[in-house]
């Protein structure tokens, strides 16, 4: 809740407070009487937050939020990158309605190697106001800040984008962590990450060492399917874990 967020952030005010990962089935409840939105408006009136936004992973949920809740929200945050542009039309509508648009997963959960092309692609889309790439070091901050977002995409750039789409497809882990917890203790995103290092980057030995150090491995999956019910991207996680087990042998 708001009070917990204020304590965790050690502040008395949050500029933008977002209702996170709203599924279609919860939207009416969240914005109805006694719902979370009502509590946030009270917090805003009390001067504890400044603005209210929403985030979603489903294009259908995004559409409902923009079409039915535009008078109550100030921002929407949605995955948008070279391989995920299914929200383009609704994000364009959001901007027409005066709703700020935020691109999450601009590097597709770390799966896009060409960070400069990835950020320029989003900037050139015309439907995004702000993008939020994850940064783990001062060097990555400087790197992202150095990108010329005003540079238009060339024919060569667009060809590279097409190549990325063909290589990556849509069935890849964004490392959001919503699949957790695994009943067998498997760190699913990290298992996928190590397999990617082995297959994609030629770091088989390096990845094998780190995979071995994990307490639970892909081969421990009992196919219960709990993770797939939680995945906002509908990934066939069990099949993907089988693929990881084949890479490392267990």
Give the label of every model feature segment.
Residues 89-250:
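Structured C-terminal cap/extension of enzyme domains
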Residues 1-102, 107-110:
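Glycine/proline-rich, positively charged
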């Amino acid at each position: 809740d708001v009070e917990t967020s204020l304590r965790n952030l050690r502040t008395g005010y949050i500029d933008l407070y977002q209702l996170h990962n709203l599924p279609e089935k919860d939207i009416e409840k969240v914005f109805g009487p006694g719902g979370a939105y009502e509590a946030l408006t009270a917090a805003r009136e009390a001067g504890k937050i400044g603005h209210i936004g929403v985030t979603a992973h489903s294009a259908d949920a995004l559409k409902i939020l923009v079409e039915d809740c535009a008078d109550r929200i100030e921002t929407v945050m949605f995955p948008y990158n070279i391989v995920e542009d299914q929200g383009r039309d609704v994000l364009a509508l959001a901007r027409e309605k005066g709703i700020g648009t935020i691109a999450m997963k601009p590097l597709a959960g770390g799966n896009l190697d060409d960070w400069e092309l990835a950020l320029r692609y989003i900037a050139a889309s015309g439907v995004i106001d702000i993008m939020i790439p994850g940064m783990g070091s001062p060097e990555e901050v400087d790197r992202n800040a150095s990108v010329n977002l005003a540079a238009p995409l060339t024919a060569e750039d667009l060809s590279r984008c097409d190549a990325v789409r063909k290589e990556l497809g849509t069935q890849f882990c964004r490392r959001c962590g919503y699949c957790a917890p695994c009943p067998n203790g498997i760190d699913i995103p990290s298992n996928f990450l190590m397999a990617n290092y082995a297959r994609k980057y030629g770091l088989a030995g390096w990845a094998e060492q780190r995979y071995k150090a994990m307490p639970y491995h892909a081969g421990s999956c009992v196919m219960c399917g709990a993770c797939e019910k939680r995945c906002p991207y509908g990934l066939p996680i069990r099949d993907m874990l089988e693929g990881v087990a084949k890479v490392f042998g267990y």
